[in-house]
Design a protein with these regions (language model features):
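N-terminal strand-loop element at the rim of the active site
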Residues: 3, 9-17, 31-69, 164-166, ...
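Conserved donor-binding/catalytic core segment of Leloir-type glycosyltransferases
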Residues: 7-9, 205-226, 232-239, 245
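Glycosyltransferase donor-sugar binding loop
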Residues: 43-47, 187, 219, 242-259, ...
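An aromatic- and histidine-rich active-site surface loop
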Residues: 72-84, 94-126, 300
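Membrane-proximal helix-turn-helix segments that form the acceptor-binding/catalytic region
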Residues: 140-158
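A short, active-site helix/loop in glycosyltransferases that binds the activated sugar's phosphate group
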Residues: 152-180, 187-192, 201
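A short helix/loop element that forms part of the nucleotide-sugar donor recognition site in Leloir-type
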Residues: 193-209
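Acidic donor-binding loop of glycosyltransferase active sites
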Residues: 284-300
Length: 304
């Protein structure tokens, strides 16, 4: 029996380094339970080639730096590569094209038509409320919203990883009668392979000036929607003797803005500790946090 070919476009690719979609795709191929599926995953790169990773075919996509439109161009180039690959291979079984996030409004109708001509189907994960992000200008927010509407209208199946997102899609776009399904993300419940006294963990604690079980932990991208400002402000007003460890991406502009507002650098308990891409180390850091603070406002998932 011919394999079911699934083409995934919209993440930055695998192996995952950061991001919810990237981690989702990485775990999807890692825990594949049948050999009847062949995944093809687009990966943003500075070259055009391909390689195998955990059984998935990963194809690199080189995209010119065109500024804010780079992500849109990446999706389009990747989708075109998927379509051309399918034409060349002439699969007997209908291919599945799975798009992550709603970026390509002006092109979705023609893409859907091309997929249909191949006998394929088009799936979409609409992500969170991207159009609500305060980092976007009004015009960009408007584009995200109209792109969301067009893509939900033209895709064959909307896969939601949040019950609230599925409810929103069904209610907001009821006139299109969208075909939706809720599929939650799994969770890795296995403890870290690192021992409590592993030098990798203890060395990290020493480097960051932290003590095991004596810190509150925040993990997520450093963007306004993750409410880092609120977390820091309220933490500064507390009397706890524990630290606040913030594992996050770099955003110097936001960092400077919050420093001007809050003067958090004067509070030695608050520690920006950079990113952690070693998943076993990150697990161990989470295991020894006194508590985890989650301030995410528009995301459904958060992995750093």
């Amino acid at each position: 029996m011919e394999k079911q070919h699934v083409f995934i476009v919209g993440s930055k690719g695998i192996p995952a380094e950061y991001g919810g979609f990237e981690t989702f795709v990485d775990k999807l191929v890692q825990y594949q339970s049948t050999d009847e599926i062949q995944y093809h995953v687009a990966r943003l790169s500075d070259r055009n080639d391909e390689f195998m990773y955990k059984g998935a075919r990963v194809f690199n996509v080189k995209v010119p730096d065109v500024g804010p439109g780079k992500a849109v161009l990446y999706d389009l180039i990747a989708l075109n590569a998927c379509l051309e690959y399918c034409k060349k291979m002439d699969f007997k079984r209908a291919p599945i094209f799975y798009i992550l996030a709603c970026r390509i409004r002006p092109f979705i109708a023609s893409i859907h038509k091309a997929v249909e001509e191949l006998g394929g189907v088009l799936y979409l994960n609409p992500d969170g409320h991207e159009w609500r992000r305060s980092k976007w200008s009004w015009a960009v927010q408007k584009y995200w919203k109209t792109s969301e509407r067009a893509m939900i209208k033209d895709c064959d199946l909307i896969i939601c990883d949040s019950k609230n997102i599925e409810k929103y899609v069904r209610e907001e776009y009821a006139r299109y009668d969208p075909n939706t399904i809720y599929i939650s993300y799994g969770a890795d419940l296995e403890p870290s392979v690192l021992a409590d006294d592993d030098e990798k963990f203890t060395g990290w604690l020493d480097e960051k000036g932290l003590r095991a079980d004596e810190y509150y932990l925040v993990v997520g991208r450093f963007v306004p929607e993750n409410n880092v400002e609120t977390i820091i402000r309220e933490f500064m007003s507390s009397s706890t003797t524990k630290d606040l460890a913030i594992i996050t991406t770099e955003n110097q502009s936001l960092y400077n803005t919050l420093e001007r507002k809050l003067h958090f650098s004067e509070d030695p308990r608050i520690k920006f500790v950079g990113t952690v891409y070693d998943q076993e180390l990150l697990k161990k850091i989470r295991e020894h946090a006194y508590a985890y603070l989650h301030g995410h406002q528009v995301d459904r998932k958060s992995v750093v």
